[in-house]
């Protein structure tokens, strides 16, 4: 199962300020089958990077992304439920073709099969994993970002299953919906950066011992609620 987080600050920061945290999240979350990031650029647009290897081993990618300055970023560390889906087309985050948002997910969506034929027949599927189905659904249902928490709740109601859902919008807002009973979502501060992250499949707060011991303002996001940062 994947790990993911959204992070935001009032003032721009270099993304590699989050790399020590990301390294520990991948190692302790056992997520080493691809990684990706989407960030808000100085041009006001979303920019993305993806690689099918591990974050730890991708020195070139870490350097490229880490050198970027942003106010908001979404990072996804992949451990797919089906290893047969490893590949570029299923590496997250998924970018909205219109540039309105970027989306990632962890867990398993129970009813993704209900939507697969619809999107496949429309020529909108490029991979095989369940996340792409929910990304396409979100593209169709997007209401301009007026109420992202409600939209993520509706997405989870439509697909069901254990799933955490993360979104970064073009205006730099980050959202993390908690819907996975096996992997809680926490919010906390790493210095001046606010973070909403999955919790390494530990139902207690061991996340803060092994991944983010320096975190302050720690809170658990209740199931079926969305953290907005």
Regions found by a protein language model. Give the residues of each.
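N-terminal segments that mediate ammonia production and transfer
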Residues: 1-229
């Amino acid at each position: 199962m994947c790990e993911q987080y959204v992070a935001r600050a009032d003032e721009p920061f270099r993304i590699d300020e989050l790399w020590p945290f990301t390294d520990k999240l991948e190692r302790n979350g056992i997520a080493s089958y691809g990684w990706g990031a989407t960030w808000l650029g100085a041009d006001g647009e979303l920019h993305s990077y993806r690689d099918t290897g591990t974050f730890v081993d991708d020195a070139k990618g870490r350097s490229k992304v880490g050198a970027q300055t942003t106010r908001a970023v979404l990072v996804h560390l992949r451990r797919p439920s089906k290893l047969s889906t490893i590949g570029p087309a299923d590496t997250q985050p998924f970018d909205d073709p219109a540039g309105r948002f970027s989306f990632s997910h962890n867990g398993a969506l129970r009813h993704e099969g209900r939507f697969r034929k619809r999107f496949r027949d429309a020529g909108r599927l490029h991979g095989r994993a369940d996340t792409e189905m929910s990304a396409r659904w979100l593209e169709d249902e997007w209401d301009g970002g007026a109420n992202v928490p409600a939209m993520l709740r509706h997405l989870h109601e439509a697909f069901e299953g254990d799933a955490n859902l993360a979104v970064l919008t073009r205006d730099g807002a980050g959202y993390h919906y908690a819907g996975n009973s096996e992997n809680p979502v926490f919010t906390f501060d790493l210095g001046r950066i606010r973070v909403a992250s999955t919790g390494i499949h530990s139902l207690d707060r061991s996340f803060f011992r092994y991944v983010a011991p320096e975190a302050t303002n720690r809170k658990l996001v209740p199931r079926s609620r969305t953290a907005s940062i």
